[in-house]
Every structure is written in structure tokens, then in C-alpha cells.
Amino acid sequence: MAREFSLKNTRNIGIMAHIDAGKTTTTERILYYTGRIHKIGETHEGASQMDWMEQEQERGITITSAATTAQWKGNRVNIIDTPGHVDFTVEVERSLRVLDGAVAVLDAQSGVEPQTETVWRQATTYGVPRIVFVNKMDKIGADFLYSVGTLRDRLQANAHAIQIPIGAEDEFKGIIDLVEKKTYMYGNDLGTDIEETEGFPAEFAEEAEELRASLIEAVADYEEEMMMKYLEGEEITIEELKAGIRKATLTVDFYPVLVGSAFKNKGVQLMLDAVLDYLPSPVDVKAITGINMDTDEEIVRESTDEAPFSALAFKVMTDPYVGKLTFFRVYSGTASAGSYVKNSTKGKRERLGRILQMHANSREEIPMVFAGDIAAAVGLKDTTTGDTLCAEKDNVVLESMTFPEPVISVAIEPKTKADQDKMGQALAKLAEEDPTFRTETNPETGQTIISGMGELHLDIIVDRMRREFKVEANVGAPQVAYRETIRQSAKIDSKFARQSGGRGQYGHVVVEFEPNEEGAGFEFNNKIVGGVVPREYIPAVEHGIEEALQNGILAGYPVVDVKAALVFGSYHDVDSNEMAFKIAASMAVKQLKDKSGAVILEPMMKVEIVIPDEYMGDIMGDVTSRRGRVEGMEARGNAQVVRSMIPLSEMFGYATGLRSRTQGRGTYSMHFDHYEEVPKSVAEEIIKKANG
């Protein structure tokens, strides 16, 4: 079977934004104009095509990135809709990993918002070129040039307008294209009556010419020939300017800014044109590299159909009709339905059962996938998020994804005996889909503990259990994922000796503990000289220390960022064994409590609160009362933005508190930033509570 669209005519893009910037509506309109939907679904009516899980339609937010294939002007555009809520950053990370380009959607009233910053940073990490769509120009307080300014000020982004709006708010009725020197006037809000004229309207001519000149100057920095022509005062053609903008955008250092209102059907088709004009095809991005697991050599996989097959699984979902669906991006080669591939990450042979091309939540079966395709497979039993799939005879692993540790936990128990078994299965399936969601059973209490990235994240997990798996559960109060660490070095001598008739137990170790760098984790060094502790017992010492650190030294929370060096010890020819050394090592950790300046660490959240002016004093006082610190303030339109750092333990139920303090006019967003030492008085409370 031949491929339908060449690689050059393929775009893999993500739509990324802050919550409520209108991302799902924008994606909807793209699907509508590319002929994929025959009726437009509105998010606020709960009928959106991309938001296909029940809770998404109820809450009006996008939770799972649905991958959709659309066509525009003879090109294939694969779109991944990503969530804008901070609790779902993992979904964003996953999708950015497999995209070639992205459209960042901004709200014309707010410009860059906190989650925009998070997503923008993630996109920069993965080297994803972007164009920016300033949406909601019809909204009260919409200000295009202010939004472009926030890109420069808050993200230090080299952003340049390639369009400007005619009018704003209710008066938003047209778009001026600075590149092609055209004007588009909209006769209605349905996108059916568009008048296109050459040139700039008289009252905007001066501003448009100025902005076009500064655009050319900015683009000339990336294109030498254009720079020469510009300096010599020669005319730069539309084709040259377009090619220059494309080249500049692909450097991931230049961002074209477009404008429109997806809800009012203005500017979406022009944005689709810009996706084709300025965002990369799989051929334009650097070839992916991987490691040959047999030889440890680096392998480059070019984006061609002739190269050996390689793909990355970026999402696993449970579908009520076909079972487990694995979304994957093909980087090189081809594969057909029914064929065998290798999961090189796990060393397992897998069969690609059926291959589906997804459209929001309907699907079309396809016989084959080619380089650059994004599709979903049925029948992959052992594949999870981040795994590499490759040709059977190959053994290449592509760079995987790293996911953040959960920061919040709750205890959960089934309401009835019948729910007990179902709950275990449901949680296992949900954990398989989402790497930032963990589930474990507390060995002492037998309680099931679920952990995730925020209250909303866990709410939605419990909700999905009820809807998809018909499991009713009671949920306990949220628990914070505290950590412990040491602040001083300590040398601990620990001996375990037991004689109880017959063969005894004997293990003796001397361990030097010292603080490690923040984020460096646990590090073990063997400094034994002359075999005072035989080599075969060393791994047992390491495991003993590591296991004991997991159980905490002050309040039972995992101890992080510690270096341990085994420096001395002794053994007994008959009585020593691995178990004895493991116990001696874990006893050494227990002695750290009084000798190492042990402290408790708590997750700190970066919180941005947007409130009307008159509540400013009240909210600032509230931040301080929650042990928070204000890190900055600014005016945004007629609202005030307070940026602060607040411990997670003080943020439970904050939404309700903020609502009542501001009569429902305040909003906030938060995401995990770092761990910080807990004040002594708070630490004493935590220890007291933990030790009952």
C-alpha cells in the first residue's frame, strides 16, 4: 500500500494553552473546517468533539489528549489536544514528546498565564517550534498587542505579529495579514461570509506598514540573503518573507503571532494555513536518536519509510469497545496490522493487532502506518507509556520520557465487598494509563493509598472508577507527600548479633552518611579495604540502607538526597549471612534520628491568584497566614495578579476559601515547584501525628 500523504505534506502538531484559553474550541473549529465534523460542538454546552470522556464534557476541561487526523489543502494534519490544567502536566509532556510543532493558544484578555509558562517551558525542553494564536478577540478586555507583549515579558519569547485584528471585543470584525498584505473582513460569526481584499485598509495602513517592517527586520536576522536585500533597500517578496518566517520558526527561537476568535469562527482557516506554512514536517526535524541495547552504540533513525521501523508509545487508554489502546508515533519505517514488532524497552515480542487512525472518539481501521504517522494499536499486551517499539530483528531504544513524582495522596476504600476486587482492577488499569498516578497498599494498615499531581487529578480518577468501572469508593482526607533528609554528616557503627541455639546471625557495619545535593537522590559507595566485609554481603548492606531510608527516620516519610559510604565492618565465618548484614545496615539508618540533623521537607506550590483590586489586602493576608510568601504582583487588565509560594499542606480546600473571600470573582492556579524544609513547630506536629 502506498502512502496517502508525503512526509513533506504531514504535520504533527499539538494545541497547547492555559485552562480556558479556548483550546478545545480552537481544535473543534480546525476539525470542522478540515471536514472532520459536520456539526460544531461547543465546550460550554458540553458537546465538544475532542473532550470525549464524560467528566470532560461535564467539567468543560480537557483531560486526556485525544489524537485526531485531519486534512487541509492536500496535507495531513495530526492534532493532539493537550490539557491546560496543571494537574495534567504529564499529558502535556507526553504529547510534546511526539510532536513536531505546536500552536500555543492565548486568551486575548489575559495574555500569558501561569500554565502557559509551564507548557511553554516544556515545549522548549523538547525543542518544539511554535506559532501563537491569540484567541477570544471578541471577549471584553481583549487586547492583542498587550498579549504579544506578555509573550516577550513573561516568557522572554522572540514573538512577532504576522497578523493584526481590526477592532476588538464586540467590534472585532476583521484580520489584516501582514505577510501577504491582505485584509479579511467577516460579515457574520459563522465564518461563512468572508471578504478578502488586497492591501491594508486606510485607517490601519500606517500601523500595519510599521509592524510589517519590524517583522521583516526580525526575520532577516535568520536569513542572510534577505538581510542583504533589506539593508540595500530592495523589495522583499511575499514568498521570500514566508520562507524566512518558516526558517526562523524552525530554529525554535522565533514565534509568529496570529489572531482570531475560534468561537466566532474568525481566523481559524488562516491559522491552519500558518500551520502548513511555518510549522515543521517530520522531514524538517532532527532525526531521532536511540541506543542499541546490544552494543550500547547510539543509533540515528532517519524519518523515511525505507529505514527500519521505530516508534514511541506515548499514551495507553482503556477503550470500552476494543480494550487496551496504545497511541504511538512512528519515527521511521513502516508496519502493517497483524505484524510482529519488538518492545525493546521491555525485551518483549508484541503483535500489532489492528491499527486505528483516531478521530476524537470515532475511529477508522487502517492496514498500515508509515514514518511520521500517529495512530493507535490494539493488541499490545506489555507496552506502557514511554516504551519503544522497533523492528523484530532490531534492539533500539529511543529516548524515553521522565515523569514527575506525585505530591498528594488519599486513602481510598470500596463501599461494599463486591467493589473490593473491582477496585483493584480499576486502579491497576488507571495507573497503566497515567504514569503520574500511583496506587499502593499500606502494609501496616492494609489501606489502599492513591497518589497524584493534585486534588483535581485524584477527583477525576475516583470519578472515572465510578463511571467506567462501576466502583463506588469512599475517599479519605488528602495527605501530603512529605520527604525527610539529613543536614549533617554522621558516622554510625551498627552491629547485629543473635545467638539462639545452633547457627547464629552476625553482621557489623560502619557507615558514613552525608547530605547529597538537592534532587540527587540516594548514592551508595563501597569503601571497604582488605575484605573486612566480604564482597558478597555488600549488595545486602546497600539494600538494607535503601529500604530503611524509604521508611523514614523521623516520621516515616522517604529520606531523600543522602550519600552512604560503607567504610568498615566485621563478619563471622559461620554466623554471617546476607540477612544479618541487611538488618545491621537498616539499624544504622535508625540511629540517624539523633545524629544527623534530620529534617522534614514539604512540597511547595507556585500559586498564581487573580483577583479584583478590592480584595488585594485580604488575599495577601491569607497567603501569609498559610505560611506562604508573596513573590510578585502585577496588574492584568482591571484585575491584580499575586504570584506566591505556598506549602501544599496549606492549600487544601483553597478553591472554596478563595471563592467566599472574593464572592466567586477570584481564580487561582498552582503547580508543584520544589521541596523545602518545614519550620520546626510544624515538623513537631507532623512527627507527633505520624508516631501517634
UniProtKB/Swiss-Prot annotation:
Subcellular location: Cytoplasm
Disulfide bond residue pairs: none
UniProt-listed SUPFAM superfamilies: EF-G C-terminal domain-like, P-loop containing nucleoside triphosphate hydrolases, Ribosomal protein S5 domain 2-like, Translation proteins
SMART domains the record matches: EFG_C (SM00838), EFG_IV (SM00889)
Start and end residues of each tr-type G domain: 8-283
Keyword field contains GTP-binding: yes
Residues that, per the record, bind GTP: 17-24, 81-85, 135-138
Gene Ontology BP annotations: ribosome disassembly
Gene Ontology CC entries for this record: cytoplasm
Principal localisation: cytoplasm
Protein origin, superkingdom: Bacteria
Family of the protein in this entry: Belongs to the TRAFAC class translation factor GTPase superfamily. Classic translation factor GTPase family. EF-G/EF-2 subfamily.
Protein name: Elongation factor G
Origin species: Exiguobacterium sibiricum (strain DSM 17290 / CCUG 55495 / CIP 109462 / JCM 13490 / 255-15)
Gene symbol of the encoding locus: fusA
